[in-house]
Regions:
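Structural/interface elements that position substrates and couple domains in central-metabolism enzymes
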Residues: 1-206
Length: 206
């Protein structure tokens, strides 16, 4: 019931953004959700936080015009944030409560402050809160997943090389180079597969 949104001060949008043929993400469900909720919250200050993965500049070019058109308000009279999650399949609950970081792309400081306080009530570790503008957050989300994909592929490449060389041990090589603080040990194991709803499509989009 979209009308219940008027009872809240913040709305988090977690809807699917399917990949299109060109690699970009389709925001049709996201835009539809905004058009359904906005009429019920346009009379007061409200924070709209998008969790779904989007193509960079989506909030500026597609979402912001919808908010302004339906509410008749400009930025500052509402808060718009990009607040993507970084979760792994099979480890979702733990990733929510013990994240490596919280990323907040904010339209204004007020919205960012409120969103930060909400997260502090949820997570149970001392994860850093990275606050930036919206476009940098949009880029960072897919860049992070693309980098992890690249690292997995590199680990598998090490495995292929070690299989072709007598005495080669992929685990030993990964342990050695992973000791370097510039590289790290995570996702370097040979034979690691990648999949799920994020890595493949985010790599293509990037």
């Amino acid at each position: 019931d979209f009308a219940r949104a008027k009872e809240t001060a913040e709305t988090f949008f977690i809807v699917q953004t399917p990949s299109m043929a060109d690699g970009n993400f389709d925001n049709k469900y996201l835009k539809s959700a905004f058009e359904s909720i906005l009429p019920h919250v346009k009379d007061k200050y409200h924070i709209f936080s998008i969790v779904s993965t989007v193509t960079p500049s989506s909030l500026e070019n597609e979402i912001l015009p919808i908010i302004k058109r339906i509410t008749g308000k400009d930025t500052g009279n509402f808060g718009l944030c990009y607040n993507p999650s970084f979760i792994a399949l099979g480890d979702v609950i733990r990733n929510i409560f013990y994240p490596d970081m919280i990323l907040i792309g904010e339209s204004d400081t007020k919205a960012g402050n409120i969103l930060e306080e909400i997260h502090k009530k949820v997570y149970k570790n001392n994860a850093p809160i990275m606050r930036t503008n919206i476009i940098n957050a949009e880029i960072a989300k897919i860049a992070l997943n693309a980098y992890i994909t690249m690292k997995i592929n590199f680990g598998n490449l090490i495995g292929e090389i070690c299989e072709k060389v007598k005495g080669g041990n992929a685990d030993e090589v990964a342990r050695i180079i992973g000791t370097d603080s510039r590289i790290g040990r995570k996702y370097l194991s040979a034979g690691t597969a990648y999949g799920g709803p994020c890595f493949p499509r985010d790599a293509i989009a990037f």
